[in-house]
């Protein structure tokens, strides 16, 4: 998977034949560096700064080649997306998704999201524990017990049912929060001394691991957003996450089972290898750290994983789950969350 990330103020993205040409300021005297990116080899264009321009010809090329263009803020959070109209699917799926809010299918989906996220959090802890069984039995036992506790939370979620999501959103969110508390507490105990990761922080964090997690979640949000559009789903009509103006509620629903699988795995694997996360004064990741993280996320998304009897790249698993959600709302199949192997 190939990301092209453009952040430097004053940069420009233009088209030349079947290539994107990225021109960036380089030092004094008005000098610029240029690099050419074949559209054939590009999966996603990320623009991460104010002061970056892109030509209409470049946008047209991206549309023709199915390359989403996502504008992200300095934390990696998507603030806008440019895609071709042809990828947005049919209105039939969107209508079914809206009806699912009050016909029980929305409850089934939201419950599956909570179960899937908890299962993958537990699997992550088992994954991190397996290499510690001999060299650190205390850590191994702590992680094993935490994973079992999260699995118990997932089993409790299976018992929740109703016809309208409004009736069960709060109980589901409470269980999701309980599983996450166990998960992050365990990871803090595991990595806190080496990375300063004490607890999960979102906005305004100065902690390097949290800053990396936030950025990774932002990139993953862009991937899931695109998958939702391709499946004909409405990104703003969520179930577990309540509607709010401008909030990608359904994208936030679907992303939950993939946070541990993609973002957490990558960030903590890098931390375990001694990655020195560079930050700017405001806590944002440096450009070098963003590029390192993007490369690792792309590698993870391209890794083949077992899924329903075959091996698929993780980014294809995400797309498969978006299609499965669409079929669920249409009444053709029951949504089953993706659970990673360890």
Predicted segments with their positions:
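Short gly/pro/ser/thr-enriched loop/turn and capping motifs at secondary-structure boundaries
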Residues: 75-81
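Active-site-flanking structural segment that lines cofactor/substrate pockets
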Residues: 21-40
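A short acidic, amphipathic alpha-helical/loop segment
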Residues: 57-61
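Short, glycine-/Ser/Thr-/acidic-enriched flexible segments
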Residues: 18-20, 27, 51-53, 76
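Core catalytic machinery and nucleic-acid-binding channels of phosphodiester-processing enzymes
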Residues: 85
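Active-site helix-to-loop segments that bind/position phosphate- or nucleotide-bearing substrates
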Residues: 1-25, 64, 88-342
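Short hydrophobic alpha-helical runs that function as membrane-insertion/retention elements
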Residues: 46-48, 67-73
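Extracellular/luminal Protease-associated
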Residues: 37-53
